[in-house]
Amino acid sequence: MAKFNWDKLLHTSWLYTKIFFAVLALCVASYVYGTYKPNESAISKVNEELDIFYMNEIKAMDLQEPEFTYNNDIQFVRAMHKCINFINFTLPKDKRVPYEMIIGQAALESAWGQSRFAKEANNLFGIRTWNKDTPHLLPQGVTKWRGWGVKSFASKCDSVQYYVDLLNNHSAYKEFRELRQKMIDKNQMLDALQLIKKLDKFSTTKDYDARVARMI
């Protein structure tokens, strides 16, 4: 009968023990690294969950739309700021539109809130409707429906909300959304002047982006 080799057994056991603890150490290190130094995907997921929680909390507060009153250009800008702040409370960060862009376009389209459509229809952006049954105004001098009208809103802040929704959802502004997302992914501030260039579908005016930019 062969003699049992205890030395070989002890050597093999010690080798496997070292391997076990080495693997265990790697697992612990990986766990610690992943816990205290999460990757970008983990950070993004946490931020997304926080945004959802934050949005739900804000909605539960049932905030009321701010009053939109003004007598001059400065007051118009202040009223716009209050309205945009109110809208942003209910929007995730990646769905927001720069203040300068919204105010610049509203100022251009509504003559700083002094246009007929702004005063009578609360429409600050000249947004149209092609549905005759939708509340609307016809252009000055037009008495019959010609296939479109300027949409009427319950309030001026309501028209701002509609404008933001339009940029966030309409297929015509896909390039705007893509550029905004690129800026967000690079942790850059949203560049209103660059984003305005993606509004070419909003108006048939060739230099529309330049006109909006001059209002900023």
Regions from the language model: what does each represent?
Residues 2-103, 108, 112-216:
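Catalytic cores of secreted/periplasmic lytic hydrolases that degrade extracellular macromolecules
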